[in-house]
Each structure stands twice: as structure tokens, then as C-alpha cells.
Amino acid sequence: MGITDLEGNPYAVPMNFAYQDGVIYLHSGPEGRKVKMVAKHPQVCITFCEGHELVYMHRQVACSYSMKSRSVICRGKVHFVEDMEEKRRVLDMLMKQYTENECKYAEPAVRNVKIWEVKVEKMSCRSFGLRPSEL
């Protein structure tokens, strides 16, 4: 995720996410550098890439190498979720990506987690080196 730091400079940080109905959800601790930055500059840019595969036309020709890939760039504004039930719903979405186990959350943990909600305002996609059947 790309954000603007307190001095107006670009700042990028990897974060776990979940996506549902045009909204990207992220989570973090309740305070810290990222939270301060987003409170001042709520506009963010989030990018995802998948399917990286090195391909080439000629093994000994460096310029013939490229990377097959798909990517998405999303822009939006961060809103912090405060509702406890909504926080649990988002935490469940995040956890279901990593485990089939049913997860429980301690009340203090839910209260202290910062849930980031980004409604996607703009989205662009790109693929490189993929056949239509691979998209």
C-alpha cells in the first residue's frame, strides 16, 4: 500500500488484505506511524500482483526475457471501522484466507485492532505476456 508520510513523501508498506464488493479491508495495530500518516493523508494506492513467471524467447539474449504477470492498482480513501461486529466480520474474512479453522477473538484484541476500509474509487488492471485463457 502506498501512502503519503507526514512530510508529504511517498511511503509504501506491505499489508494483509481482504476484498469484498468493491472494498479492500486491511488491519494494523491501533496506533503508530502508518495510522498517523493516513489520519493526515487518507488517500491511498494499493497494488496487487500475481502469476509471476519468467519467460524468454532466446535463452542467451537478455532483452528477450520478460515476466508473465497480472496486476491491479486501486485508489481510494481510508476509513477506520469502529463498530465491533463489523471488525469481527472483517477479521473473519482475513482469517478465512489463511485457515479453515473457526477463529475467536478476545474483546480487548477486537477493541484495539485498527480495521482499514478502502472503498475503491479507481481501479486499473494490466496483464503482460498472458494468453486470454490465462487472464
Residue ranges and their predicted role:
Residues G51-L135:
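Charged, gly/pro-rich active-site loop segments
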Residues R33-Y56, C63-Y65:
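Helix-adjacent hinge/juxtasegments
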Residues M1-P30, I46:
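Short beta-strand segments
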Residues T4-P10, K34-P42, R75-E82:
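A broad, low-specificity signal for short, low-complexity segments enriched in glycine/proline
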Residues V13, Q20-G22, K40-V44, K68-C74, ...:
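A generic structural signal for short beta-strands and their flanking turns/coil linkers
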Residues A12, A18, A39, A62, ...:
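A sequence-composition feature that detects small, non-aromatic residues
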